[in-house]
């Protein structure tokens, strides 16, 4: 898993793009140039309410004050955003910057790491322009530590993009989820994940990934998945109550093996997120102390209770399931994907009723970057209130990314990551899909004609 010359070349490509005329803009806020953002409304995340009007005072990359009115220092630039709602930048806790729509296996086999890295920079920009100022990239899917180059280019101001937590490749067992198991063995097709078959190998892999720049760990805990109805594997349910459908996603690591990974990540000052669709893998993950259970299609009563007690968020990723159902290659595949979505919705409602903590993660990449605000709409459609979904995005998302004291609120001392949307998102959650203004770290990246700069 050594950093290859291809990855080093990708770093150079990203740097070149960042310095190209017309590509970069000023990406460092001037602390001597205060900015006051003014809008008709402001979303107070902690209180879970809209206040009117709304103002945010920004100096440098940080918020100085926020509320219905703030001090206007001498010489401050006032940006009047009119009939909009000021909100913290959105957080997507599950993205894939190195993927785009189309067959994933073909991307990882046919596209070079430099090509995928360039595409990842474009994906990062699209996500930022959609209002996502912080993201957790859940694996490069075969591009190794190339995400380190993208993160450093963003942090260095070379290219626009969200604040990132990155994992490099995810970790999986030999022959497990994301391994190249459908190819002619003579072709020696590389896995999209890094192999680790026991606790010792998990720890070793985490250390090597950390050396190459990863800032959290992703582990595949379950897969592949199957949905069974009427005792007929592979036959999608077409009627009846999902309560009686049989979903199966075998675990890959024991609780002890996962715990070894969690302990090593903790020693390094980071955490572990798991791809987990079913039981008993979800219980093993919760017992091991992971930071999140992503997809979380099936959770037992015991697992849900443990997640509540330890405040381990589930990350449902509805948008990718809906996208696959709507873009299936055949009628049979569409029926299967719609059945999977129906089962997932049924289980999600159980989880919400049980009080399982939620975070917002879309799994964007296989569907177009910059469109993932749809995830918040779907979580509302399937059972949560707009306030609950927004607080899940901001508070639990910030917790997962371990930036809970820096992002997710319009509060003094937090990063000046601010967006504005038309209307009131508590009345209509789809407003988050119409972001009109984006500021990250005190720098304005997007401003549509909704107000005036003074």
What are these regions (language model features)?
Residues 102-104, 147, 228-230, 282-289, ...:
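Histidine/acidic-residue-rich catalytic or RNA/ligand-binding cores of hydrolases
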Residues 26-33, 42, 47-87:
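Histidine-rich, glycine-flanked metal-binding segment
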Residues 7-19:
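Bacterial N-terminal signal peptides
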Residues 85-158, 174-177, 182, 288:
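Metal-associated gating/positioning segment near the N- to mid-region
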Residues 98-116, 174-190, 225-251, 310-341:
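Active-site gating loops and adjacent loop-to-helix segments of metal-dependent hydrolytic enzymes
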Residues 121-145, 161-170, 214-224, 271, ...:
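Divalent metal-dependent hydrolysis catalytic cores, especially in the metallo-beta-lactamase
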Residues 267-271, 340-425:
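His/Asp/Glu-enriched, well-ordered alpha-helical/loop segment
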Residues 149, 200-314, 338-357:
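Histidine/acidic residue-rich metal-binding segments in metalloenzymes
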């Amino acid at each position: 898993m050594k950093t290859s010359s291809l990855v080093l070349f990708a770093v150079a490509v990203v740097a070149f793009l960042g310095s190209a005329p017309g590509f970069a803009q000023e990406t460092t806020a001037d602390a001597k140039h205060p900015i006051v953002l003014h809008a008709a409304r402001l979303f107070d995340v902690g209180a879970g309410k809209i206040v009117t009007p709304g103002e945010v005072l920004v100096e440098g990359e940080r918020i100085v004050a926020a509320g219905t009115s703030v001090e206007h220092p001498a010489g401050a630039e006032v940006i009047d955003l009119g009939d909009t709602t000021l909100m913290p930048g959105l957080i997507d806790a599950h993205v894939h910057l190195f993927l785009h729509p189309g067959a994933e296996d073909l991307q990882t086999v046919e596209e070079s790491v430099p090509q995928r890295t360039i595409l990842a920079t474009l994906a990062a920009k699209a996500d930022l322009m959609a209002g996502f100022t912080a993201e957790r990239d859940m694996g490069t899917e075969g591009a190794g530590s190339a995400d380190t180059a993208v993160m450093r280019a963003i942090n260095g101001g070379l290219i626009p993009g969200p604040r990132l937590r990155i994992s490099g490749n995810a970790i999986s067992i030999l022959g497990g989820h994301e391994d190249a198991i459908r190819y002619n063995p003579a072709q020696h097709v590389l896995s999209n994940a890094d192999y680790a078959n026991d606790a010792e190998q998990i720890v070793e892999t985490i250390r090597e990934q950390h050396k190459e720049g990863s800032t959290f760990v992703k582990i595949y805990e379950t897969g592949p998945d199957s949905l069974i109805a009427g005792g007929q594997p592979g036959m999608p349910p077409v009627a009846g109550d999902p309560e009686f459908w049989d979903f199966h996603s075998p675990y890959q690591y024991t609780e002890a093996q996962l715990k070894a990974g969690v302990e090593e990540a903790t020693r390094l000052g980071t955490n572990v997120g798991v791809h987990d669709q079913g039981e008993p893998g979800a219980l093993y993950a919760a017992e091991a102390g992971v930071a999140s259970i992503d997809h979380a299609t099936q959770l037992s009563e015991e697992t849900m209770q443990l997640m509540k007690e330890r405040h381990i968020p589930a990350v449902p990723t509805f948008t990718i399931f809906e996208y696959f159902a709507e873009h299936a290659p055949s009628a049979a595949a569409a029926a299967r994907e719609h059945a999977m979505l129906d089962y997932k919705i049924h289980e999600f409602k159980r989880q919400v009723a049980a009080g399982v903590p939620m975070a917002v993660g879309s799994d964007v990449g296989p569907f177009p970057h910059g469109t993932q605000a749809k995830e918040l709409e779907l979580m509302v459609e399937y059972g949560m209130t707009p306030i609950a979904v927004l607080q899940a995005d901001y508070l639990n998302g910030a917790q997962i990314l371990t930036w809970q004291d820096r992002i997710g609120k319009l509060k003094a001392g937090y990063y000046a990551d601010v967006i504005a949307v038309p209307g009131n998102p508590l009345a209509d959650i789809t407003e988050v899909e119409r972001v009109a203004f984006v500021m990250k770290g005190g720098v304005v990246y997007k401003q549509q004609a909704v107000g005036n700069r003074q």
